[in-house]
Amino acid sequence: MNRKGNLSMTTQLQHLTLPEDIQQKLLSYKEQPISPEFQSLIGTSGYEAEDEAILFDAIIALAMGKNVLLKGPTGSGKTKLAETLSSYFHKPMHSVNCSVDLDAEALVGYKTIENQSGQATIEFVSGPVTKAMKEGHFLYIDEINMAKPETLPILNGVLDYRKMMTNPFTGEVIRAKSGFGVIAAINEGYVGTVPLNEALKNRFVIIDVPYIKGELLKQVLMSQSALKDEKLIDRFITLSSDLIVQANNGQVSEEAASIRALIDTCDLAAYIPPRRAIERGIVEKLDDDREKAAVRNIAETLFE
């Protein structure tokens, strides 16, 4: 790593005023060489929160070898936080997107037939869990509570003090390389989710990730969206605030209040009328006609 990168990293860490030993641990990760094939898996920073403790505590937990579970509503920035952590630790992050169809092969890997010099051989292709463990990288499990409960026990040994797993397809015992860490995310109350069983939940340090609001949201929209009209952005911030209230009251689903959807909408509003942008970026993502009407009503009061 060059001197400029080292100075940049040091500045980031001083901004958070992390304990000296934690800073040194992060700087040591920064010095470790990363194989070119994994360089693109290192996340980019950019997560913002009103409460600095969210990022601070996540860094401390990961640096101490803890597994971190990010809990929060849809679009509150959990994935962006995970990418920011990957950036701070300068670690590639292998991702698993959970669904009811998730199986052991999607986690661990699968066998395939390869043709070498005219001979058919069976090879094992590593999955994200296997790669992250062997390389000492981060593993990100998104929407972990979307997976079927019977799929997840394969991770129990990976997530406890042993940090090991027996590959069910090859019999290989895999012990995680130093530096391996797990970040998972859940959307509570989301359709299709199931409660995490206590044995799995107890393997994590849990960090709540709420929606961002007000001036901080304005900074995010100004920096991360194509829209630069401050007056228009202020109206979108009011829209977001109203939608968060309605989502908390159960009048609209969390998708309507998603910060990710709001950024998409602001991007569109840089080129098309705001209400049409809201239709494309927020309203049409909703399934319930009453929710669509509620969002449209708010939009009509804020935008001509």
From Swiss-Prot:
Recorded GO MF terms: ATP binding; ATP hydrolysis activity
Keyword Nucleotide-binding set for record: yes
Signal peptide, first to last residue: none
Entries under InterPro entries matching the protein: AAA+_ATPase, ATPase_dyneun-rel_AAA, CbbQ/NirQ/NorQ/GpvN, ClpA/B, P-loop_NTPase
Keyword Oxidoreductase part of the UniProt annotation: no
Gene3D superfamilies (alphabetical): P-loop containing nucleotide triphosphate hydrolases
Protein origin, superkingdom: Bacteria
Keyword line: ATP-binding, Nucleotide-binding
CDD domains, A to Z: AAA (cd00009)
Full protein name: Uncharacterized protein YojN
Species whose genome carries this gene: Bacillus subtilis (strain 168)
Gene of this entry: yojN
